[in-house]
């Protein structure tokens, strides 16, 4: 036994592939199986190796009809549409990363347990699964009852650490969030049908598209003290990766912008190091491609109108930062549950 935590990935899309890349950079976790009904092993290898945003994987990757090999290690591959038919147990996967965007509630995600998985982490918000954000409420994870959990969204992972620090130090009376969000796979390259979201059906290139997001309200689930105090919306913009949160809040306690930045900087160097980061340089979005932090506070971009009314700005690589938190959460779950350590 290698001593590494063994995980499986269901859905080899943007997050699935980047979660795998993130595990390759860690000594204590490895992917042993991948399921995707739309991709064979040869195509998996190609999609893993070449990435338009995060560049070519520098190591050895090979895919054939016989399997998918990374750095000489064979990855079990499945092409099942029904998650209950995936033999995770035979592949040795104890924790499954559910990254299809389809099986996002407890009833659907529980199907992975039938195949031998012990725990499931959903890489999307869930209506009923407990939601955990690293650096915010992950210590509340209960291995005895939490078999299916959610890692929330990339935007919630950026917003929640920021809101936690500000609320704990100065108190948030109420606030509005806007995320200027990079393109995602659900958007269209040319105008097309989108019955539930007409504006979302417009071409991604050449448009700034207003959109809804539950990210701000979801903060109330991981930080109950902020329930009902935050809401927000999104603008989808034609960039490949990296998004930015604008959090505008009314504070309970009068303060200065400098003191807020001091509190955030201290948190980034202390209890939230690795999750929350801080910069006072003249940065732009591309500077954060493949940045592993959930949230990087931009000290120069924020503004304050009065001692209790402030706009805070924070960057996040909505793909790579989030994928690293998925891996962190899997390691935390394994540690708490003592899964094959």
UniProtKB/Swiss-Prot annotation:
Listed EC numbers: 1.2.1.12
Pfam families, alphabetized: Gp_dh_C (PF02800), Gp_dh_N (PF00044)
GO CC entries: cytoplasm
Annotated active site: 154 (nucleophile)
An annotated Gene Ontology molecular function: NADP binding
Residues that hold NAD(+) according to the record: 14-15, 36, 318
Site (Activates thiol group during catalysis): 181
CDD domains given in the database record: GAPDH_I_C, GAPDH_I_N
GO biological process: glucose metabolic process; glycolytic process
Compartments where found: Cytoplasm
Keyword Oxidoreductase: yes
Main location: cytoplasm
Superkingdom of the source species: Eukaryota
Pathway note: Carbohydrate degradation; glycolysis; pyruvate from D-glyceraldehyde 3-phosphate: step 1/5
EC primary class: oxidoreductase
Keywords: Cytoplasm, Glycolysis, NAD, Oxidoreductase
Reaction(s) the record says it catalyses: D-glyceraldehyde 3-phosphate + phosphate + NAD(+) = (2R)-3-phospho-glyceroyl phosphate + NADH + H(+)
Family assignment from sequence similarity: Belongs to the glyceraldehyde-3-phosphate dehydrogenase family.
Quaternary organization: Homotetramer.
UniProt protein name: Glyceraldehyde-3-phosphate dehydrogenase, cytosolic
Gene: GAPC
């Amino acid at each position: 036994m290698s001593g590494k935590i063994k995980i499986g990935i269901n859905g080899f899309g943007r997050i699935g592939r980047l979660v795998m890349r993130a595990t390759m950079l860690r000594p204590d976790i490895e992917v042993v199986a991948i399921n995707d009904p739309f991709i064979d092993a040869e195509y998996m290898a190609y999609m893993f190796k070449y990435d338009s945003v995060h560049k070519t994987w520098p190591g050895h990757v090979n895919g054939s009809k016989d399997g998918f090999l990374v750095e000489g290690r064979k990855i079990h591959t499945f092409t099942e549409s029904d998650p209950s038919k995936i033999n995770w147990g035979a592949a040795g996967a104890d924790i499954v990363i559910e990254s299809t965007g389809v099986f996002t509630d407890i009833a659907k995600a529980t199907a992975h347990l039938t195949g031998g998985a012990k725990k499931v982490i959903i890489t999307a918000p869930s209506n009923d699964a407990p939601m955990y954000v690293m650096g915010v409420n992950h210590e509340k994870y209960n291995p005895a009852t939490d078999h299916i959990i959610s890692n929330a969204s990339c935007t919630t992972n950026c917003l929640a650490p920021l809101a936690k620090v500000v609320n704990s130090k100065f108190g948030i009376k109420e606030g509005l969030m806007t995320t200027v969000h990079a393109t995602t796979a659900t958007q269209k390259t040319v105008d097309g049908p989108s019955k539930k979201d007409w504006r979302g059906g417009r071409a991604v290139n050449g448009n700034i598209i207003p959109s809804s997001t539950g990210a701000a309200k979801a903060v109330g689930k991981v930080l109950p003290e902020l329930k009902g105090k935050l809401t927000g919306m999104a603008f989808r913009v034609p960039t490949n990766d990296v998004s930015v949160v604008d959090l505008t809040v009314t504070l309970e306690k009068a303060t200065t912008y400098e003191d807020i930045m001091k509190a955030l900087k201290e948190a980034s160097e202390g209890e939230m190091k690795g999750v929350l980061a801080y910069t006072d340089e003249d940065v732009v979005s591309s500077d954060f491609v493949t940045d592993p932090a959930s949230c990087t506070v931009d000290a120069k971009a924020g503004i304050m109108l009065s001692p209790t009314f402030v706009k805070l700005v924070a960057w996040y690589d909505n793909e790579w930062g989030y994928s690293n938190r998925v891996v962190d959460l899997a390691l935390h779950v394994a540690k708490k549950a003592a899964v094959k350590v």
